[in-house]
């Protein structure tokens, strides 16, 4: 079981690394966010692998801290991804800046915890468990988990909103990412008190990372291709207008421009 679990995490790390590399070679802000997101997720996977397989209180404590830090920044990247992917969160600059400021402070406190143990202490390591005792009276212990869960709930609500308000061409992609995030969140909640090294939420979040890459930069609905080809073949002499998944006009041919006297199309 221990070997199989480690092999699963290692495979996910490799796949996320491949996703990051492929996203790096694509253009656009969304591709850049996906590249950074996949890279940080792959790094988090490596740290988690070291956490469960390399013995030693100090190195295990450091890797636990780094894993928690990675989750802070992954959530920020996921919010930016959601912004560019769905068009939401454009008007919440102050909130995003506050999230970055909190994550920076939280990162410093978690690194310092390796020596001062003010947030958590690892008391025992064996083949099946890493016993972690959190200082539940510490502000940053409470703030870290409240912050993480609130952001995940916000992201889930945002994807629910997009599923309800998008065409069937795009809602399928939102649904897949929503389901993966929801499963990871539920597994995280269910196992929050578990000291087992077999954290079932980690593979779920890893799968979500790969789904994000695929449905953002690779997936094109067959129905969209068929309908687009049909439109071009049958209605070449008609006015054509195309919208993206946010409902914004991304293309308008000359015939439609002349019909409506359009001189500028915002892309």
Regions found by a protein language model. Give the residues of each.
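Individual alpha-helical transmembrane segments in multi-pass integral membrane proteins
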Residues: 1-13, 28-114, 145-149, 199-206
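PAS-family sensory domains
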Residues: 260-261
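Conserved small/polar residues in nucleotide/adenosyl-binding loops
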Residues: 265-267
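Extracellular-loop-to-transmembrane junctions of the mid-late helices
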Residues: 1-11, 110-158, 189-201
